[in-house]
Each structure stands twice: as C-alpha cells, then as structure tokens.
Regions:
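Short, small/polar residue-rich loop motifs at catalytic or cofactor-binding pockets
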Residues: 36-38, 60, 158-160
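Short, hydrophobic alpha-helical segments
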Residues: 192-194
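Structural microenvironment flanking redox-active thiols in thiol-disulfide oxidoreductases
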Residues: 76-137
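N-terminal targeting signals for export/organelle localization
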Residues: 1-40, 44
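Short active-site neighborhood of thiol/selenol oxidoreductases, capturing the structured segment around
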Residues: 54-75
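Generic structural signal for well-ordered beta-strand positions
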Residues: 51-52, 173
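Short, acidic, Ser/Thr-enriched surface-loop or helix-capping motifs
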Residues: 45-46, 167
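Thiol/disulfide oxidoreductase modules built on the thioredoxin-like
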Residues: 133-188
Length: 194
C-alpha cells in the first residue's frame, strides 16, 4: 500500500472506529430514546408518610403513572404487573415493588391510593403528593399527563401508559407497553433480581 493511500485511509478508519465506539456507548446508556429515565421524587404513601425514590433502594421497581378513576389502561397495567410479579418465586417477589404514582392528586388522596393499590395485591405502593411533587416525578420519568375537562364539571386525565423497570439502585432498565405480556415482564424482572 502506498503512503498516499495509507494517509487517505487512516482518517476514514479512525472515523469508522469512532462511530462504532459512539454507537456502542449510545446503546449501553440507561435511557429511552436518548432521554434519561427516573430520578429523585418526594411523594406520600397510602398511610400519609413521606417517601422518596431512596425508600425503594435495594428493590427493583415497576413504576407506572396513572390515576384511580382511569377506566381501562391503569387497571390493566397494574393487573399485568401484579401477574408478572406473581410468576416470581417468593424470594424474587421480596425484591420487587410495584410503584403506582397518581397523575390526579386532586382525587387520589393517600387513603384512596392505599385502597386502590391494595386491590392488586401486596407489594403494590400507591403514591400521591402535591401537584408540584407529582409534576416533578413525572418530569424525572418523562411522563406526559394532562387534565381533560368533560361536560358537567367532570374530568379525566390523559397520560402516557408505560411501565418502567428500574433496577435495585433506581437505574432505568427497560420499558413495557400494553403489548408486553406478564410472562415477558417476569422474565426481565428475573434478570434484574437474579
């Protein structure tokens, strides 16, 4: 190979190696679509006690944002998460918490959240808080929500419907949609708690 050809190919090789390295770095990042997912929050549990993201440190979390008056997506997602956790061994189940965060703090008081969450079994935490605290938690998880006014003074909440899998250190692992089966969720949970 001539020196001139080598001088022409060297920069192209360096560029290709750099792009491959950048691609590997990008693929390994704990994010979805380039945005980091998860972070600190300060909310209130069903007993009115303050909780933070650190309350769940050492446990894997399935995090879902919704509301108790949700007619379909929220109960379906919570049932799917509960079914997935139910497929785990007792020792694995102890390492997982389902964290249901309301996007409707006006109606979803601590008592309402506790009652609603308990319908889906043990290990389900219903969290609420001030509108500002809910907005902060939603920003950390990149969750969309908005109040939709209806006739007669009633309202519903529009919201993203994604389950976030976080590891025992609170780091983002994966997302699940309504197309994800409880079996597939359980398989991913086993990787995180195993």
């Amino acid at each position: 190979m001539t020196r001139r050809r080598l001088l022409l190919l060297a920069p192209a090789g360096l560029l290709a190696a750099g792009m491959a390295g950048a691609g590997a770095w990008w693929a390994a990042r704990p994010s979805a679509g380039g945005a980091s997912i998860g972070g600190p929050f300060r909310l209130v549990d069903g007993d009115g006690r303050g909780v933070t993201d650190q309350t769940f440190h050492g446990k894997a979390m399935l995090v879902y944002f919704g509301y108790t008056h949700c007619p379909d997506a929220c109960p379906t997602a919570l049932q799917d998460m509960a079914s997935a956790v139910g497929e785990l061994s007792p020792a694995e189940r102890e390492q997982v918490r389902i964290v249901f965060i309301t996007v409707d703090p006006e109606r979803d008081t601590p008592a309402v959240m506790k009652s609603y969450a308990s319908a889906f079994g043990p290990g389900v935490e219903g969290l609420t808080g001030s509108p500002g605290a809910i907005a902060q938690a939603a920003r950390e998880y990149r969750v969309y929500y908005a109040r939709h006014e209806e006739k007669g003074g009633e309202y519903s909440m529009d919201h993203s419907s994604i389950v976030y899998l976080m590891d025992k250190q609170g780091r983002f692992v994966s997302v699940f949609t309504h197309q994800t089966s409880p079996d597939a969720m359980a398989a991913e949970l086993r990787k995180v708690v195993g």
